[in-house]
């Protein structure tokens, strides 16, 4: 086995650590008890597996990052039904941004000062992004409110059916079926 310079340093560190762990008796005989052997093995393991452990941790973290990104993509479902008004508002914002950029290009000061043009465009883009984020937050809050209303309604209907003295008693299977129908409608984006 070939040792590189870093491997030699690691090996020298291991051999330097062994005497500091070993206890000597008065007769100059090394005493190796179980703790000493475990400590030596652990130090050797750390020194010689440092590179492979680093790669393992990096691969683990990279895998976790990928899974988090996949989970985030699931939240931004392209099949989600977005209200017509939000689509229309986004379209109008894009058009106004294009119009503003053409107006800025036609201004004589924009020809003289390209920095001004970039600043105005950056400001318009930032305003567009803020309005877009506000619109997405409003859409998201509407969806959350709808889900809360569905859950509340389902809880109310279940508790109403199991109240003592109620004349209408539904079986558990019927309740589960109703719940699944409601969930399917919510996932598809249909109305309830």
From Swiss-Prot:
Task: Name the InterPro entries on file.
Answer: ATP_synth_Bsub_B/MI25, MI25_plants
Listed GO biological process terms? proton motive force-driven ATP synthesis
Q: Name one Pfam family in it.
A: Mt_ATP-synt_B
* A single GO cellular-component term on record: proton-transporting ATP synthase complex
UniProt-recorded Gene Ontology molecular function terms: proton transmembrane transporter activity
> In which broad location class does this protein mainly occur, judging by the first location in its UniProt entry?
mitochondrion
Keywords in alphabetical order: ATP synthesis, CF(0), Hydrogen ion transport, Ion transport, Membrane, Mitochondrion, Transmembrane, Transmembrane helix, Transport
Q: How does it sit in the membrane?
A: Single-pass membrane protein
- Give the transmembrane region(s): 29-49
State what this protein does.
This is one of the chains of the nonenzymatic component (CF(0) subunit) of the mitochondrial ATPase complex.
Tell me the protein family, please. Answer: Belongs to the ATPase protein MI25 family.
Assembly with partners or alone: F-type ATPases have 2 components, CF(1) - the catalytic core - and CF(0) - the membrane proton channel. CF(1) has five subunits: alpha(3), beta(3), gamma(1), delta(1), epsilon(1). CF(0) has three main subunits: a, b and c.
Q: What is this protein called?
A: ATP synthase protein MI25
Source species of the chain: Triticum aestivum
């Amino acid at each position: 086995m070939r040792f590189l310079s870093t491997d030699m340093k690691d090996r020298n560190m291991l051999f330097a650590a062994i005497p500091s762990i070993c206890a000597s008796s008065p007769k100059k005989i090394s005493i190796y008890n179980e703790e000493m052997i475990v400590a030596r093995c652990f130090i050797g393991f750390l020194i010689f597996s440092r590179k492979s452990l680093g790669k393992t941790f990096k691969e683990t973290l990279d895998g976790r990052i990928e899974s988090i990104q996949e989970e985030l993509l699931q939240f931004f479902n392209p099949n989600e039904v977005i209200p017509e008004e939000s689509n229309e508002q986004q379209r109008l914002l894009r058009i106004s941004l294009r119009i503003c950029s053409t107006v800025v290009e036609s201004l004589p000061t924009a020809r003289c000062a390209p920095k001004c043009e970039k600043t105005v465009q950056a400001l318009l883009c930032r305003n567009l992004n803020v309005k877009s984020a506000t619109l997405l937050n409003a859409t998201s809050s509407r969806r959350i409110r709808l889900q809360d209303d569905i859950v509340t309604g389902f809880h109310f209907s279940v508790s109403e059916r199991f109240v003592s003295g109620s004349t209408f008693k539904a079986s558990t299977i019927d309740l589960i079926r109703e719940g699944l129908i409601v969930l399917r409608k919510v996932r598809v984006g249909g109305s309830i």
